[in-house]
């Protein structure tokens, strides 16, 4: 499992997201 905290965080780009999360198409980290 990758190091992505399970929090709902809005984003515009991957760097907006914590840990190893990426910015998904719906505009939230995942």
UniProtKB/Swiss-Prot annotation:
Pfam families named among the record's database cross-references: Squash
Any one GO CC term of the record: extracellular region
CDD domains: PlantTI
Family annotation (SUPFAM superfamilies): Plant inhibitors of proteinases and amylases
Superkingdom of this protein's organism: Eukaryota
SMART domains: PTI
Residues flagged as site, Reactive bond: 6-7
Subcellular location: Secreted
Protein function: Inhibits trypsin.
Disulfide bonds: 4-21, 11-23, 17-29
Keyword Secreted attributed: yes
MF terms (GO), sorted A to Z: serine-type endopeptidase inhibitor activity
InterPro entries, per database record: Prot_inh_squash, Proteinase_amylase_inhib_sf
Family (UniProt): Belongs to the protease inhibitor I7 (squash-type serine protease inhibitor) family.
Entry keywords, A to Z: Disulfide bond, Knottin, Protease inhibitor, Secreted, Serine protease inhibitor
Domain notes per entry: The presence of a 'disulfide through disulfide knot' structurally defines this protein as a knottin.
Name of the molecule in the record: Trypsin inhibitor 3
């Amino acid at each position: 499992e990758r190091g992505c905290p399970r929090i709902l965080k809005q984003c515009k780009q991957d760097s907006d997201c914590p840990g190893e999360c990426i910015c998904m198409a719906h505009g939230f980290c995942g």
